[in-house]
């Protein structure tokens, strides 16, 4: 059965997900660009992929929920309004990063923190680097990693440094520094294809759900089972 996908935010991520979807036999029924006038009730879509700006992501998602459509949100920087999404009683998937590698980095970082906090000489820090068109700084992925480390028991503040350079897809490093050595856990995205494949996997996974608000942890845990 051919699934019908609507994309809000037809930029780099939106186009990458569209390519994967079409290659998998889906059809794209709507491509919403900046300043377009749109109504999700007119799309005849099965699901929506949202990848725009932090200030518009929640309102876009709420419009789709009101139209009865499940939504995958790839935009970051809007999580201060998460309660609005949760209270809307729709079917939503969101992630600060759709890379499976980043999810593994987060899990390893949690374990690493539990070990490293036993040694008071080590101080954690996070470094992230992205392309110059990246809108939020530090990245949502870096902020998520910081929360994971803090929750896992880090006793010292976690400093985050962010930089923007041309043609950098995405680099994240968790560093543990002491006076005698440095331990670095690093993830570098080589292309956007990994994000797009993860985004498409999230679309497929969410289609099986009736309602709820889900994250990468939910999807990966479900796949593990």
Feature map (PLM): residue ranges:
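Anion (oxyanion) recognition and catalysis
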Residues: 22, 65, 86
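C-terminal substrate-binding/catalytic lobe of Rossmann-fold NAD(P)-dependent oxidoreductases
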Residues: 4-7, 12-42, 53-55, 120-225
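A charged, well-structured terminal subsegment
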Residues: 111-122
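N-terminal Rossmann-like NAD(P) cofactor-binding module of classical short-chain dehydrogenase/reductase
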Residues: 48-49, 72
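Rossmann-fold NAD(P)-binding glycine/threonine-rich loop
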Residues: 55, 62, 75-95, 100-112
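Glycine/charged-rich beta-loop-alpha catalytic/anionic-binding loops adjacent to active sites
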Residues: 45, 87-95, 178-185
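Amphipathic, non-transmembrane alpha-helical secondary structure
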Residues: 58, 62-66, 106, 110-113, ...
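A short helix->loop->beta-strand "cap" motif at the edges of active sites that frequently abuts
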Residues: 67-70, 88-90
């Amino acid at each position: 059965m051919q699934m019908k996908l609507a994309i809000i935010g037809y930029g780099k991520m939106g186009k990458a997900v569209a390519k994967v979807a079409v290659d998998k036999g889906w059809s794209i029924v709507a491509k919403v660009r900046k300043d377009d006038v749109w109504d999700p009730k007119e799309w005849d879509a099965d699901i929506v992929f949202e990848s725009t700006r932090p200030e518009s992501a929640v309102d876009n998602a709420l419009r789709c929920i009101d139209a009865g459509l499940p939504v995958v949100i790839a935009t970051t920087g809007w999580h201060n309004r998460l309660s609005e999404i949760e209270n809307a009683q729709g079917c939503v998937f969101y992630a600060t990063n759709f890379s499976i590698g980043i999810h593994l980095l987060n899990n390893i970082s949690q374990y690493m923190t539990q070990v490293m906090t036993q040694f008071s000489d080590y101080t954690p820090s996070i470094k992230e680097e992205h392309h110059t068109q990246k809108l939020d700084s530090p990245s949502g992925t870096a902020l998520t990693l910081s929360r994971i480390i803090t929750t896992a028991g880090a006793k010292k503040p976690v400093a985050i440094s962010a930089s923007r350079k041309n043609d950098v897809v995405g680099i994240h490093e968790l560093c543990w520094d002491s006076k005698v050595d440095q331990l670095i856990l690093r993830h570098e995205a080589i292309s956007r294809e990994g994000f797009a494949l993860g985004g498409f996997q999230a679309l497929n996974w969410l289609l099986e759900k009736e309602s709820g608000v889900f994250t990468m942890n939910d999807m990966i845990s479900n796949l593990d089972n």
